[in-house]
């Protein structure tokens, strides 16, 4: 990676979003997905480029934390949806981004609010070209106000 080193927690956040998406679409359990990421996705060399290292402990905490607290996390997200919208109406990737971000805001007070929101908005931008990143920014900001004020 040319000079622009990605932080291990940033890599862990992206991996957690991917893992949450994988669990939702495949029905796989959190422990098997964490194991798969550890064995096959972290510390890889792709086309001669070493992928940035992930904070694997942080990744596992995010994935397990979302699964353990998903009902409460989803309640916080649903409060941010337009009237008549259901969580299932959102794209599965957007749900994964929101769930991971909401988990950090609600349960990881050691991580600054601005860092959490910025990281997940950037992840959203890597998946979406439309208004989704703006929605995710607004939803996470509102969740942060509820959880941290």
From Swiss-Prot:
GO terms for biological process: DNA-templated transcription termination; transcription antitermination. The keyword Transmembrane does not apply. Keywords: RNA-binding, Transcription, Transcription antitermination, Transcription regulation. Pfam families: NusB (PF01029). Involved in transcription antitermination. Required for transcription of ribosomal RNA (rRNA) genes. Binds specifically to the boxA antiterminator sequence of the ribosomal RNA (rrn) operons. PANTHER family: ANTITERMINATION NUSB DOMAIN-CONTAINING PROTEIN (PTHR11078:SF3), N UTILIZATION SUBSTANCE PROTEIN B-RELATED (PTHR11078). This is Transcription antitermination protein NusB. It comes from Caulobacter vibrioides (strain NA1000 / CB15N) (Caulobacter crescentus).
